[in-house]
């Protein structure tokens, strides 16, 4: 079933390429590009709580680096760390290894060595949007995620994965691209 969907997607893209390619190039040229959040790439949530801190790593693309917010405390990593501190009753030290626009394959080569420099208890891998827009094959995407997860687990981390957001609802994309990328994601 999965292979059928992949073939259908590529056939649909081929048929719609005369419309989709100019639209994609125009969107890439004119889309609003927001900077990553400012501030330190590490922090502490629940520092007043007792006990040894839980060490959290968020590794990934634009969501990981807080694109769209001013401070990382307001981004995914800061909110996740605060929630973990509240639920666990212990402090959470957090850090981010990420890059706006990076794919999982690129991150495995460029960001994973940096991510492994310090001990981690819990790692969240945040990938999928850029892999969808860069047309990374499902096999290469899964292989890169598995490689990063295996390396992090070998260093003692528990690993979690975020889901790929519903690209079909991204209002910044024209209708045709939303449909194609949403189907692919």
Where are these regions (language model features)?
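Residue-level detector of flexible, active-site-proximal loop/helix-junction positions
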Residues: 25, 29, 101-103, 166
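Charge-dense, low-complexity intrinsically disordered segments
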Residues: 5, 12, 67, 135, ...
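Alpha-helical cap/lid subdomain in secreted, periplasmic
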Residues: 110-185
